[in-house]
Amino acid sequence: MTLWINGDWITGQGASRVKRNPVSGEVLWQGNDADAAQVGQACRAARAAFPRWARLSFAERQAVVERFAGLLERNKGELTAIIARETGKPRWEAATELTAMINKIAISIKAYHVRTGEQRSEMPDGAASLRHRPHGVLAVFGPYNFPGHLPNGHIVPALLAGNTIIFKPSELTPWSGEAVMRLWQQAGLPPGVLNLVQGGCETGQALSALEDLDGLLFTGSANTGYQLHRQLSGQPEKILALEMGGNNPLIIDEVADIDAAVHLTIQSAFVTAGQRCTCARRVLLKSGAQGDAFLARLVAVSQRLTPGNWDDEPQPFIGGLISEQAAQQVFTAWQQLEAMGGRTLLAPRLLQAGTSLLTPGIIEMTGVAGVPDEEVFGPLLRVWRYDSFEEAIRMANNTRFGLSCGLVSPEREKFDQLLLEARAGIVNWNKPLTGAASTAPFGGIGASGNHRPSAWYAADYCAWPMASLESDSLTLPATLNPGLDFSDEVVR
């Protein structure tokens, strides 16, 4: 029984699904997808639970969420292992995901009050008030790269605001999704407030097609996000929050400490085996001897990165990708770039057949025409050379995406110029692109999405503002507008 609907664990009526560790092949989870009827059942449960949940005081909803935070803390070790085994990422990195999940809850509580709480301004004849109200029933689509942390960034603010939810985790991480839902159950969440439907494309399409849905919160690929946007077009009554990918540029200008710059680049491009939406996909490197030295050092250090299993000791920097198919797709993308005329500096290697272990790849594309503006979601870094900083900014902005952008340079003036001209939601200076804080907006523009699914800014799309003019008594104004006559005379 792997679906959680209206407080009950039930068996899916859709296709069967098996999840294996992407490196060892160990079977981790087995179950069945939710069919369209069960998706509808989850929606009805959420709709029925909404009035009571929304009418609870904020303190009562907060108490449930804080109990969930306590359960995360107490079950940190077990949940870390589940996420690591299912995604293939090393234990050390899965542990950082749990820490982020826990920390985000307190930030979400504060954000509710600061960004979407209640405000009152006194007026001579009354008051002007601002309140926020929940949308109703929201669908949350989770990604596979951070199957606990990223859905949590939607779910917690949505619940705090008073919404009820239907959650569909990625079909590649059903075990993590189920494990987190069982903690919500232990936290005492009332039946129907949060519902879990497992499944792939068919389940997702049934969920997004629900008429009685008030909104959809999505983190994932641009292709899926575009499909959802088209599906919900013409329905302005539904909130749609999209956080998608990026073809992110990292500008390497003047470098004083080459090893520090190489470390920043590896953290930007290859952490999580390149499976972060903010990962650097393009290095824009200033032409010259210093750029040559940086590139040689980057290749030398990157070729030492050997992916391993989640529990290897000593721990590897990167693990496997989410699946063997995902690793093969990245490898094929490198082959296609090479066939277009790219110059391979570090060839990626599929280490073992039947696994997702893939070493990083680096390929220079300077002067190659027609390179696709696509996100390759894995450890593949493309390099272009530039001559002037203005050219670097033009190259950085030459993408339909707009998620993250970074600059390595000692010159504050160049960063100030980049801040003015960059088309990206995240612009960093001498910091990895993959660093993020839950107190800052996380998201981008263009094909990278619209709203900002972090603990702080998620409050904005989880509730709608209600403005009120109020007075505890009704009196006739002392001065009336022209043309109004309230005298006792009878007009003949």
Swiss-Prot record:
Molecular function per GO: aldehyde dehydrogenase [NAD(P)+] activity; succinylglutamate-semialdehyde dehydrogenase activity
Q: Which Gene3D superfamilies match?
A: Aldehyde Dehydrogenase, Chain A, domain 1 (3.40.605.10), Aldehyde Dehydrogenase, Chain A, domain 2 (3.40.309.10)
What does the record give as EC number? Answer: 1.2.1.71
Keywords linked to the UniProt accession: Arginine metabolism, NAD, Oxidoreductase
- Keyword Cytoplasm part of the UniProt annotation: no
Which Pfam family, any one, appears in the UniProt record?
A: Aldedh
The similarity comment for this entry is:
Belongs to the aldehyde dehydrogenase family. AstD subfamily.
> What PANTHER family does UniProt report for this protein, alphabetically?
ALDEHYDE DEHYDROGENASE-RELATED (PTHR11699)
In Swiss-Prot or TrEMBL terms, this protein is called N-succinylglutamate 5-semialdehyde dehydrogenase
